[in-house]
Amino acid sequence: GVLDIGSNSIRLVVFEGDGRMPIPLFNEKALCGLGMGLQETGHLSEQGVRSAMDNLERYFTIAKGMGVSEVRVLATAAVRDARNGHEFVSAVEGRFGARVMVLSGDEEARLSALGVVSAFPEADGVVGDLGGGSLELVDIQNNKARRFETTPLGPLRLGELTRQNRDELTDRIDSSLNGVLWLDSMSGRDLFSVGGAWRSLARAHMELTDYPLAVIHHYAIGAEEAVRFLDEITRTGRKDLRALDAVSKRRVEKLPVTALVLKRVIELGRPRQVVFSSFGLREGCLYDRLPRGEQSRDPLVDSCMDIARKSSRFSPHPEVLERWIAPFFEDVPAAEQRLIRTACILSDFAWGEHPSYRGEHAFIRVLRLPVVGLNHADRVFLAYAILVRYTGSIEEEGTHRVRKLLSIRRRDLAYRVGLALRLALTLSGGATELLESARLERERDMVGERGFVISMHGHQGGLGGDVVTRRIAALSEALGQDIRIEH
């Protein structure tokens, strides 16, 4: 488990195992406000300390009851900077018998960046992690943190944004950001936004634009649109902000100032887009402890393999399925080959649902899977592919709302992938090892490609039948090429 003592909130996350993508079993936060008033007094809030100790009591009790082997306790800006921070740490260690790691600003920035790296393979840009007491900025490239900077721009330090202090707060924010000498390296790259306050802004944007997929991780907003939206938030009254269903009422008071910070980061850094990340410090703490070989594994593939092992009928052999359908998709780009591999992994995970609802259930579940390493369009691609695998149709009721997130070309590809999986799993009955003896190949002649042939000889010739014939006909029509069986 990881227990994160932040300036505004305390959160315990308990993970199952410690591999490349451990699954969260428990995730709860308490808004304690340890850093409330720190800028004026230099001390942790007395009320915040009382609330923190009460909630820590709960979290350590839960961790013990779950049999958690180790709880790593991390403390960030408020505890690091407060004059009585050492007293608080001593009180926690004495009462709960746990060592508290008070992270330096650089270490906090590094771990937050590693959390993003763990969730975004090949991430290239700048991580901005806004906590209650500070904003960490980290330049990441080639899965490494290159430069980092800590700035005192947490909302608890800045206070509330009003019409009267808008110019003063903007000057304070700009003064800190101008001290980040490499900030212009963000230009034209991605800004990865980490932290609960900024995730609240993402939720608000989703609600106001009627976005069809309520998944914060990898939600992206173009820089110009983000600046317009954030400016609107900074000028909206508290009453109207409280009317937003997607934003916690305890986050509303600080929403304008957190919007102003993000707006100035975008205006000064000039990224191409803002990408929101649900992975940060806690996940970076786990990722940092993995061997390098484990770190380099694909988080999407690993997560989906864990899901498949727990929910498939048979021991999953996605590599057999992937090899078998590969001739249909030889010309597909590498990024989509990776999604086809993932679709093969998930192709049987909804078998336990009622047959009338398998497609619907699989579609919704894939859209909402707690996995990373894919953007929202990728989620929709996988959801459609698995829907078609179960139903044979991409026009099922209830699936149209997310359609706009996927291009027509990719939707057509998802349809063909789903039909190919449907054929392969029908042919083998789900026991995909049988596909090893039903070879699929392209047919070519002197003129060029003629289509595909499935060679079934000996006892494997018995795999054919009416259902298989219908599946072949559907896929053949979608591909615009002949598929025939050779006995």
Descriptions of predicted regions:
Residues 124-138:
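A generic, well-ordered mixed alpha/beta core segment in the N-terminal half of proteins
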Residues 73:
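Dinucleotide-binding Rossmann-like beta1-alpha1 core, especially the glycine-rich loop
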Residues 7, 132, 196:
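Short, glycine/acidic-enriched loop or turn micro-motifs at the edges of active sites
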Residues 479-487:
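A short amphipathic beta-strand at an alpha->beta junction
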Residues 1-4, 125-129, 191:
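Short glycine-aspartate micro-motif
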